Swiss-Prot record:
InterPro entries: Glutathione-S-Trfase_C-like, Glutathione-S-Trfase_C_sf, Glutathione_S-Trfase, Glutathione_S-Trfase_N, GST_C, GST_Phi_C, Thioredoxin-like_sf. Conjugation of reduced glutathione to a wide number of exogenous and endogenous hydrophobic electrophiles. GO terms for biological process: glutathione metabolic process; response to toxic substance. Residues 88-215 form the GST C-terminal domain. Residues 2-83 form the GST N-terminal domain. Keywords: Transferase. This is Probable glutathione S-transferase GSTF2. It comes from Oryza sativa subsp. japonica. Glutathione binds at residues 12, 41-42, 54-55, 67-68. Coiled coil: none annotated.
Length: 215
């Protein structure tokens, strides 16, 4: 069977969220770059893959998927179902909870920091809006307090097993490490240990190697 095709840019943490899971699941895939400066993400052929003209999009044979977390779940179901814990009702429910936490709590606090510190200088030649950064750092710290409490009870977010919920944090947190605020994790020893453990995995190292924002 032909490898899956992941369309997008490896500087997008939504794309590399999928890479973390594809790598961890041992899936066969290739990355098909899109040139945003040429509007390739809005071209008809890409709109056929993702009708919103965004990335990522995944092609597996005649199946086209979009939305990064949906892609991640599909890859797990196909290649490594244990990352979803679908065989256990309670464990799979906790995976779902923490994937939702990443989507609705962690990433909304993190994304404005990444935009201000990485995207704004790179794309617009403008300095970060420090007020926006500080406001969202405070939001992120509140989220990390919840993570710290959770990780005192188990090694990973859903339990004592790695899951798609952990892997979904990798790309964004790698980008956090490229900002002046990487040390925010240091105040939370269990979060820091969890992150160190994640970054020792080959899947996370692959993501880090692909995501190299300009200095």
């Amino acid at each position: 069977m032909a490898p899956m095709k992941l369309y997008g840019s490896t500087l997008s943490w939504n794309v590399t969220r999928c890479v973390a899971v594809l790598e961890e699941a041992g899936a066969e895939y290739e990355i098909v770059p899109l040139d945003f400066s040429k509007g390739e993400h809005k071209a008809p052929d890409h709109l056929a893959r993702n009708p919103f003209g965004q990335v990522p999009a995944l092609q597996d044979g005649d199946l086209f998927l979009w939305e990064s977390r949906a892609i991640c779940k599909y890859v797990c179901r196909k290649n490594k179902p244990e990352l979803l814990k679908d065989g256990d009702l309670k464990e799979s429910a906790m995976v779902d909870v923490w994937l939702e936490v990443e989507s609705n709590q962690y990433t909304p606090a993190l994304n404005p920091i990444l935009f201000q510190c990485l995207i704004r200088p790179m794309m617009f030649g403008a300095p970060p809006d420090e007020k926006v950064v500080e406001e969202n750092l405070e939001k992120l710290k509140k989220v990390l307090e919840v993570y710290e409490a959770r990780l005192t009870k188990c090694k990973y977010l859903a339990g004592d097993y790695i899951s798609v919920a952990d892997l979904s944090h990798v790309a964004g947190t790698v980008c956090l490490g490229a900002t002046p605020h990487a040390s925010v994790l240091d105040a939370y020893p269990h979060v820091k240990a969890w992150w160190t453990d994640l970054m020792a995995r080959p899947s996370s190292q692959k993501v880090a190697s692909l995501m190299k924002p300009p200095a």
